């Protein structure tokens, strides 16, 4: 069901789930399964070969989590979403999906302390350089950019400074150079929709306002479907535009965007490589 034009309250309550067709239940069920039945070997081959999209294994997808992913995508105006185990996982994955050892990203220096430490130390151990800049001047992102820059990163309302990040200005600079802006929107879900201002990817810690009551830890990554990875090219974005040995040599933008006709090559790459192999897996949440 399309939710374009619906009230946010309606989207928050109903996106991604109507009712169980067999029982009529309006509550989202918890699918406690690891595996899924394929119709036949051809169906399995089609799923694994990225000819069609569907459930393969709960490490990378689950119908319960799918409701959360669809609901948040609808609220944010995203093409697709991916639930992961925590907000820190979402931040790390969002970068690792495009940057490799020897690459760099440009990040706002106004960050939550856990993210700052992750970027400064953990990503450094993986060979990914993070260049921190003062976000009050968008031009600082462009000044720090070189031919190895793969992404820009910032928080909408950084913890703890709460100084609003200039999403539109930095996103425009990024697109000029073929660089996506990734925005951690944990502090302002629904109130701010970064995709409306040009961001390519958003991340969330669902533990905060989305959960709302301190009982559930989780994270989300949303793909706006609005970034032209093919136009960015193989020199700027090799992770999406060159053969990926992690999944049989597939070229993600070519296969997902052009062959499958889906606008979320970034997210499908993340789901079928990082989530499958490294697996800070998403959770089957007890409540949506």
Predicted feature residues:
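N-terminal glycine-rich, Lys/His-bearing helix-loop that initiates the first secondary-structure elements
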Residues: 1-55
């Amino acid at each position: 069901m399309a939710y374009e034009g619906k009230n946010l309250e309606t989207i928050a309550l109903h996106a991604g789930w109507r009712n169980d067709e067999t029982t009529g239940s309006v509550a989202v069920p918890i699918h406690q399964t690891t595996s899924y039945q394929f119709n036949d070997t051809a169906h399995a081959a089609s799923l694994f070969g990225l000819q069609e999209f569907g459930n393969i294994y709960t490490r990378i997808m689950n119908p319960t989590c799918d409701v959360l992913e669809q609901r948040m995508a609808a609220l944010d105006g995203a093409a697709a979403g991916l639930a992961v185990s925590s907000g820190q996982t979402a931040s790390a994955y969002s970068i690792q999906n495009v940057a490799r050892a020897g690459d760099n990203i440009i990040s706002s220096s106004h960050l939550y302390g856990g993210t700052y430490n992750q970027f400064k130390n953990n990503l450094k151990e993986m060979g990914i350089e993070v260049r921190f800049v003062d976000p009050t001047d968008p031009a600082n992102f462009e000044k720090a950019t070189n031919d190895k820059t793969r992404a820009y990163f910032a928080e909408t309302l950084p913890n703890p400074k709460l100084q609003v990040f200039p999403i539109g200005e930095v996103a425009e600079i990024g697109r000029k150079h073929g660089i996506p802006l990734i925005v951690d929107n944990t502090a302002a879900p629904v109130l701010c929709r970064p995709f409306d201002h040009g961001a390519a990817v958003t991340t969330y810690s669902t533990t905060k306002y989305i959960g709302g009551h301190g009982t559930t830890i989780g994270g989300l990554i949303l793909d706006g479907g609005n970034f032209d990875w093919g136009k960015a090219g193989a020199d700027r974005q090799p992770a999406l535009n060159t053969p990926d040995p992690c999944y049989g040599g597939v070229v993600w933008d070519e296969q997902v965007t052009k062959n499958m006709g889906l606008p979320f090559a970034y997210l499908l790459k993340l789901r079928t490589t990082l989530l499958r192999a490294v697996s800070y897996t998403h959770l089957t949440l007890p409540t949506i």
